[in-house]
Amino acid sequence: MNIIALPAFSDNYIWLLHDGRRALVVDPGDAQPVLKALQSTGLDLEAILVTHHHPDHTAGVSELREATGATVWGPAREAIPEPFIPLHDGDTVTALGVAWSVLDVPGHTAGHIAFWASDIDGAPLLFCGDTLFSVSYTHLRAHETVLDL
């Protein structure tokens, strides 16, 4: 599994994971960096994972879905661009052949979720959006969830 950090805005990253043929992105606040990366690599976007509703994590979702037909998964308790598959704590999403566990990590937003895979090429991987964000209100329960991993 390959992971690429795509810079977005002045201080964000959009995470692109791929297996050499298929890709998924996490929290695409801007479609353009993702579309450029897909074009330059020839990858097919199959999945979009969203951790919370803030525009710097969702503004590119609709354009990417329309351009690629990718399936969108996001937190059930947040306003994610429709259509998307709503997720709750304990759900599992399979994308790129990986089972991603959904963790409820409220704090930065009330419905914030994280995506956890216990074994990506022998190592765990967590996409927690802005759960661990130094300049924002956070909630200790969310941190406890992440620490328990």
Regions found by a protein language model. Name each.
Residues 1-3:
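Extreme N-terminal starter segment of soluble prokaryotic enzymes
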Residues 9-10, 23, 28-104, 118-119, ...:
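Active-site HxH/HxHxD metal-binding segment of metal-dependent hydrolases
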Residues 14-16, 113-115:
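Short beta-strand scaffold segments in enzyme catalytic cores
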Residues 52, 108, 130:
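Conserved G/P- and acidic residue-centered "switch" motifs that form tight phosphate/ATP-binding loops
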Residues 55, 59, 111, 133-134:
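Short active-site segment of divalent metal-dependent hydrolases/proteases
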Residues 104, 111-114:
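Ligand/cofactor pocket segment of small-molecule handling proteins
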Residues 127, 132-133, 137:
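Internal catalytic or translocation cores that form aromatic/hydrophobic pockets or channels
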Residues 138-145:
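Conserved small/polar residues in nucleotide/adenosyl-binding loops
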